[in-house]
Amino acid sequence: MEELDELAREAGELARPLNGLDPTTFPSIAAMERDIVGFMRRTLHGTGSGLLRSPVVGSVTSGGTESCLLAVKTARDLWRAEHPELARRLAREGRRPRLVTTTLVHAAFQKAAKLFDLEWDPVPCEPDGTAPASRIVDRLDDDVALVVVSAPTYPSGIIDPIAEVSAAARRLGISCHVDACFGGLALPWWPRVEPWDFRLRGVTSISADLHKFGYAPKGVSVLLHRGRRRHRAQFFATTSWAGYPVVNPTLLGSRSASPLASAWAITKRLGHEGYASLTSSCARSVTQITQAVASIPGLTIWGNPTGPALALIADESLPAHEWVDPHHLADEMVRHGFRIQHQPGSTQPDGARLPHSAHLTITPVTERALPEFLAALEQAADAVRGTPRAEARLELAALTALGFAPRSVGGRFRMPSPSVAWLILRVAGVNPGADSLPGRLAPLMTLVERLPAPVAEALLTELLARVSEP
C-alpha cells in the first residue's frame, strides 16, 4: 500500500497546477477522466451489445456525497420533464416527488432530498438489517422520482435486493440508482455476489468511490448513467451572463485535478488483476474476523453482510449478563490500539428498532495486523462482557427538565441555541479544542440515541463547529 501512496503523491503533484473547470484548456484532464470512466464502465458491466442504444457514460466527482447528490438531482430533473402535469399538481397540493430508500441508506440521500426539494420516504428494515424487496416495491408509484438501493449499506454491510427492486422500477418507468460508493471497487471481485450492477437492466445509475476501495486519495468518485440523455441532465450550462460560457458536469466549478490524476495512476497501476488481489486480502480478513466473532460469547455480527464492511452487535439470544455491548467494546478497543466506529441505534418510521453497533471497515492493511486485532477483540470483549448499556441519566434528566427532551413519546420539545448546546456537551464530557471528545464515547452515543433527532443533530453540529472555531 505504501507504493500506491507514493504513486498517488507523485501523480497528484504533477497535476497540482491544473484546473478541472475546463478540460478543453487542459486536455490531459479530459483524457484521465475518460480513462477512469472507461475503467469503471468495464468493471461495472456497462459495456456490451445490449447497451449500444443506451451506452453507459459518466463523470468523475469530488466524492461519494457529490455523486449521490448528482444522481438525485438528475433523476428529479428527468422526472419533472417527464411528469409536468403531476409535478404541478403536487406543487398545488403542497406535496413533493418522493425519494424512496431504505432506512439504512447513506445519509447523503437525506441531504439530497433536503437540497433538491424531495420527500425522503425511507422503507423500514428488518432487525437483521435486510430490506424486503416487496416492502420497497410497494412504495413505488408515479410520484417517485428515484428509488435508491445500496451495494452495500454502510452501517451493516448488507446488500439491498437490487435485482427485484430495479426490475420493478423498470416496469414502472422509475429511475433506480445503486449507491455503490462503498462497495463499487470491492464487490466486482468479491466471491459469490449476485449481479447488482449494469447487468440489471433496471439500474439507471451507479455511484462508486475511488477513494475507498479504489485506494486513491480522498476526493474522487465516479457517477455512471445508463444513457447520454440521463448523463447530460446532470450538467449545468449557461450563456446567460456576461462572462465565459459556463458548462459544469458536476456541482463544483473549479476543481483540483490532483485527486483525478492520483486515481488515474492507481487504476492504471493496479488494473483488474491488482484490484482482485487486494480484494482477496479483504475477503480473507472478513472470513477470519467472522470466525473469531463466532467464538466470542455475547458478541455477534449484524445480519449477513457481503463485502468489506460488517457491524458488531450484542448477542441478545444469551442472558443479559453475557452480552458484549458494542459501544463499550469500541471504547475498550482504543486501549488496545484499535479504533472501531460507534453507531447509535435508531427507531424507524414504523417504530421498529435497529440495534446500536460497532462498524468495521476491512482493508488490505487489516490482514497485516489481523492476529493483534483478533487478540485485542477477544480481550476487549472479556473486559466489558456483562457491562450494562451506558447511561446518560443525569444529562437526559437535565434536558427533560429544560424542555429539550420530551417527557413522553411524541411529546413536545425545544431546540437548544448554540450556547445551550455547548453547555450540554460540556456536561456530557466534551472538551474545547480539537481533542474534544471524551475518552469513552458510549455515554455520548446513548445520549445521541435517546434524544429527539433534531436535538441530537443540533448538539453534534455544535460539537463539530466548535472544533474548528477560532
Mark where each language-model region is.
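Generic structural signal for well-ordered, non-membrane alpha-helical segments
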Residues: T25, I29-E33, G64-C68, T102, ...
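Short Gly/Ser/Thr- and Asp/Glu-enriched loop/turn motifs at secondary-structure junctions
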Residues: R53-P55, G94, G303-A309, R353-P355
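Hydrophobic, well-ordered secondary-structure elements that form the walls
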Residues: D179, I206, C282, M333, ...
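Conserved PLP-enzyme active-site core in the AAT-like
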Residues: S59-P249
